[in-house]
Regions:
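Well-structured core secondary-structure elements of compact alpha/beta domains
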Residues: 1-35, 46-69, 95-125
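Short, well-structured alpha-helical segments that form the helix of a local strand-helix-strand
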Residues: 40-45
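Short, low-complexity, Pro/Ser/Thr/Gly-rich segments in the mature regions of secreted, periplasmic
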Residues: 135-145
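Short acidic-hydrophobic surface loop/beta-edge motif
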Residues: 83-89
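Glycine-centered loop/turn motifs
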Residues: 74-76, 81-83
């Protein structure tokens, strides 16, 4: 077992959608003005479509290892109290605010981590093989209508 320091972020979010790309700047400006006037939590209550909006957008403590690369690159250089620009998440946009940062010492069971990674990789490969097999069956199947 190894000991490792883990960086944790206390995050809050505002998740919003737009009708079309032209509305992005307008919506972003409205949200930023609201954050400046009434604060991030109240703005999350108003604008966020996420369930976390009921709690002022607060997500809780999140390990940097649990963040996607896209999100990590956006928040990595921010200081406590700062927020990201809107991050495109496909169907919606995400604004994250760092409320606090802390480091925790964590004991790492190397065997367990290796076992988890092997299991994840095996599952990924099985999914890939099953898709390939399904596509072959789909190609070779003829459906005759009456």
């Amino acid at each position: 077992k190894n000991e490792e320091k883990e960086k944790l972020y206390l995050l809050s979010e505002i998740v919003f959608e737009i009708d079309n790309q032209n509305n992005l700047n307008e919506k972003k400006d409205n949200i930023n003005n609201s954050i400046n006037e009434i604060g991030f939590k109240n703005s999350a209550n108003i604008y966020s479509i996420s369930d976390s909006s009921k709690f002022g957008g607060q997500i809780g403590w999140v390990s940097e290892k649990d963040l996607s690369k896209k999100i990590f690159t956006q928040i990595n250089n921010l200081k406590v109290g700062e927020q990201t620009l809107p991050i495109n998440m496909g169907a919606s946009f995400l604004i994250l605010k760092i409320d606090d940062v802390k480091f925790e010492k964590k004991l790492i069971d190397v065997k367990q981590v290796l076992s988890n990674k092997i299991e994840i990789e095996t599952e990924r490969q099985l999914q890939r093989f099953s898709k390939i097999y399904f596509n072959q069956v789909k190609i070779n199947t003829n459906i005759n209508e009456l």
